[in-house]
Curated annotation (Swiss-Prot):
It comes from Saccharomyces cerevisiae (strain ATCC 204508 / S288c). It comes from the Eukaryota. The chain crosses the membrane at residues 29-49. It is found in: Membrane. This is Uncharacterized protein YBR209W. One of its GO terms (cellular component) is membrane. Keywords: Membrane, Transmembrane, Transmembrane helix. It is a single-pass membrane protein.
């Protein structure tokens, strides 16, 4: 029974070596750890930047409230072709005519 157990354990080690004990295993684990931390840092920074840009956009809209134009007029300015304008209105880009957007100076 004892010899069988040791033989069984040795066969398991041959098929699936313990990655934590070898140099390549440690390097692999360190690389995966660094990769996961870099991904988490990227996600955190993207949310931070997105929050800053949203805050900046709200501030810009508050600053240019005197220069705002109706959305329908802005759509007419953005799309010169009449057919494109009507297609975009049908798609719902300009779903409300009372909405205001800021015109660029």
């Amino acid at each position: 029974m004892n010899a069988y157990w040791f033989h069984y354990r040795a066969s398991i080690k041959k098929e699936a070596p313990n990655y934590k004990r070898t140099f390549l295993g440690r390097a692999r684990n360190a690389f995966l750890l660094i990769l996961s931390e870099a991904y988490l840092l990227f996600v955190f920074l993207s949310y931070l930047i997105r929050g800053k840009s949203l805050e900046k956009r709200v501030n810009d809209e508050a600053k240019c409230s005197q220069r705002c134009v109706p959305l329908q007029l802005a759509n007419n300015l953005a799309f010169g072709d009449r057919h494109k304008r009507s297609a975009n209105f049908k798609k719902g880009i300009a779903n409300t005519h009372s909405s205001l957007i800021c015109s660029k100076p």
